[in-house]
């Protein structure tokens, strides 16, 4: 065998629907830097941002068919392809980003049904990302209880928007990028959002009340690799990639949680001249939010069972993993501290 330094370098094309900016993108580039470093330059990633190769909807089949070697796959764009994995997008009683992302990573790596779901698409699951907890930012409206949501025009995502609708809000369908204009023109009272995304979309310029719901997160977003490309890698490179996928969970959580903390610090202090009040939804109200999500968990179970998955087994394993990592966090703190 040739010494490692003499192995031909392999360039892996990466498709990403998102523009090249922000914490998640920085962490994605870290993954590529680490892969090159840990394989002594044998594996390198060539990134294509902003949907330049293919958009988010096309990425799942595109990576599976070899139009790209790797990339970010967002489950919500193709729900029928990922009935099991979409459990990751549902509200859970645990909202810590490290806990959630570590649990879903472990679940996919160790659950035969979920492995098969990815393999059927000719994809190898590498690692996972999370939006972090869903919070609420409003203009001139303070939300102290779920009662206060009634009648408010709110933009949201997936099941989280549906639950708000069930609780009496008026759901408004628009993207998070349109929320700024929606709030400034009065089409919206509030938008569901993640901490780091508030300054990213400059929402503190048009809204002044944040209620921390700390409610679930969207985690049905995976870094995947074409399975044929993965299978053709030498064993040592597979091992390196698998270890890196696990290390990424910690690295990403550390960076994204720091991004959230900094965003809140800046908007609370009015760093850019726009001060925002930040309050927490009381625990009893948070519990009601989780309760209101139950019908959608049942809906997920039915869809997963219909596609031949052991839905109860997947769900129970996921809850057990969430509890395991939450207990670990409480006992030992985060791995990077």
Language-model-detected regions and their locations in the chain:
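Core domains of carbohydrate- and sulfate-ester-processing enzymes
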Residues: 108-112
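N-terminal secretory/targeting leader peptides
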Residues: 8-101, 113-337
């Amino acid at each position: 065998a040739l010494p490692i330094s003499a192995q031909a370098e392999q360039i892996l094309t990466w498709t990403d629907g998102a523009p090249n900016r922000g914490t998640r993108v920085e962490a994605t580039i870290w993954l590529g830097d680490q892969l090159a470093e840990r394989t002594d330059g044998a594996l390198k990633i060539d990134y294509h941002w902003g949907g330049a190769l293919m958009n988010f909807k096309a990425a799942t089949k595109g990576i599976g068919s070899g139009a790209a070697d790797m990339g970010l796959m967002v489950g919500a764009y193709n729900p029928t392809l990922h009935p099991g994995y979409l459990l990751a997008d549902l509200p859970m009683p645990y909202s810590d980003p490290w806990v959630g992302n570590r649990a879903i990573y472990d679940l996919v790596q160790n659950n035969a049904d979920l492995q098969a779901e990815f393999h059927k698409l000719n994809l190898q699951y590498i690692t996972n990302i999370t939006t972090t907890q869903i919070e609420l930012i409003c203009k001139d409206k303070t939300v102290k209880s779920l009662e206060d949501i009634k009648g408010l025009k709110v933009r949201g995502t997936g099941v989280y928007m549906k639950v708000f609708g069930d609780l009496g809000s008026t759901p408004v369908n628009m993207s998070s990028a349109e929320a700024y204009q929606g709030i400034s023109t009065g089409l919206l009272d509030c938008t569901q959002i993640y901490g780091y995304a508030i300054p990213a979309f400059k929402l503190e310029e048009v809204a002044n009340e944040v209620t921390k719901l700390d409610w679930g997160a969207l985690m049905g977003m995976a870094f995947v690799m074409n399975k044929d490309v993965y299978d053709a890698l030498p064993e040592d490179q597979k091992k390196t990639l698998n270890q890196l996928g696990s290390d990424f969970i910690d690295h990403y959580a550390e960076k994204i949680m720091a991004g959230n903390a900094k965003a809140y610090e800046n908007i609370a202090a009015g760093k850019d001249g726009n001060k925002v009040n930040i309050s927490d939804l009381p625990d009893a109200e948070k519990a009601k939010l989780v309760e209101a999500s139950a019908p959608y968990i049942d809906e997920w179970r039915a869809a997963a069972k219909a596609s031949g998955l052991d839905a109860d087994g997947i769900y129970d394993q996921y809850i057990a993993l969430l509890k395991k990592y939450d207990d670990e966090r409480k006992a030992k703190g985060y791995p990077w501290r």
